[in-house]
Amino acid sequence: MNREEFLRLAAEGYNRIPLARETLADFDTPLSIYLKLADQPNSYLLESVQGGEKWGRYSIIGLPCRTVMRVHGHHVSVTHDGVEIESLDVEDPLDFVETFKARYNVPTIAGLPRFNGGLVGYFGYDCVRYVEKRLANCPNPDPLGVPDILLMVSDAVVVFDNLAGKMHAIVLVDPAQQDAYARGVAQLDELMHKLRQPITPRRGLDLDRAPRADPVFRSSFTQGDYEAAVDTIKQYILAGDVMQVVPSQRMSIDFKAAPIDLYRALRCFNPTPYMYFFNFGDFHVVGSSPEVLVRVEDNLITVRPIAGTRPRGATEEADLALEEDLLSDHKEIAEHLMLIDLGRNDVGRVSEIGTVKLTEKMVIERYSNVMHIVSNVTGQLKNGLTAMDALRAILPAGTLSGAPKIRAMEIIDELEPVKRGVYGGAVGYMAWNGNMDTAIAIRTAVIKNGELHVQAGGGIVADSVPVLEWEETLNKRRAMVGSAWWPWPRRLPRVEQACCSGNER
């Protein structure tokens, strides 16, 4: 874009204008670019692997963000360069987010990637309390104390095009600033200079190192307490109070490694459709989620329910046998069909009548440690609604709550010993152009104050077996735990004790 085009867009009323530069990406990876440009607080890296086997087309590297929004309960704090510029209590923080996003008027520029800036971060599980008044107050303690919503204004990004072997460096420029165009060009020049610099070497992750002593996790449940919670849920189901509930347990362990090294191990051992690394300064969120929460692209809503799990086999023949066993398991099929219906209902709440479609039904997707049954539901967003309306309708996913959703979440509040926080919420972005792409925050670690916290759960139905449900939570944490301790252990850390068991509440 030349200066005349920039000034024309400014005259049309746009208050942020993207300037971009394209270059070959044959000497770099998304991770190396992140380490060169963005390895500081309030930065991020988003990557994708399709079908567990093929890297998605775009990876997004978010340079350190100057403006950050944090929401605790109903209190909103906005900082710029670390200085608080807004502090207020609001009735509905989701409304505030939408109003805040509307402050940025950004043109669509032909030839740029579909994401070139927006609000990036997460909406925690407890955001449902802004929507459902029956759930307005969380009764459980919050030992992590992270924000319910944390969104960064991402106005400088590098988008890595894995298909074309190119990358786009993009900066959003405020045309009201003095010499705005020249300053934007200078910022791009500086980015390109940094891209040409060698990467600072990091320690290797040696696959052949000898194992260390077994580490021990601290769990929010003992095995007995978790199995008792499953039995309680089954009683609710038999009484006709609910059809399914998805309880979870949090597991915590001391963690002294660099969080980026956990991400390096995850992208090697457990590549998924949603890989993410967030450095929020006082804590990190690192994840490899297999499941979209909700995607809105050109007003097409997509949700992709995942329910039904088996561990991976050692051979192709073993995998096929496990797939057959999974697809013939009446409990798993019943659970999945229930969640398809819930997904249709959620999408239908914000879709034009007659547009909701089941485009894939009960296909198997394989990941590094487990395989899942997956379906795909789409709908056309109603005229006049926005991506935030879709998020309101769908968060949290039925796969993380149950059915009927509100009653299931009341039971979760009753039985789980701690506030969920990031777990079960939405991780991703809301782009300036109205699109949104969010993953369910599962297979996700929160690293804070020298501890790593990971949470896992499973859907409980009438014929669930408590000990098997406990084992399913351990299988689901396997990729994260193995990566956190890679390459040292050849067996997983033990879960030894409850740090806040249900019996102590």
Curated annotation (Swiss-Prot):
One of its GO terms (molecular function) is metal ion binding. Keywords: Amino-acid biosynthesis, Aromatic amino acid biosynthesis, Lyase, Magnesium, Metal-binding, Tryptophan biosynthesis. Feedback inhibited by tryptophan. Its EC number is 4.1.3.27. SUPFAM superfamilies: ADC synthase. Coiled coil: none annotated. Its cofactor is Mg(2+). Heterotetramer consisting of two non-identical subunits: a beta subunit (TrpG) and a large alpha subunit (TrpE). This is Anthranilate synthase component 1. It comes from Pseudomonas savastanoi (Pseudomonas syringae pv. savastanoi). The lineage of its organism: Bacteria, Pseudomonadati, Pseudomonadota, Gammaproteobacteria, Pseudomonadales. The gene is trpE.
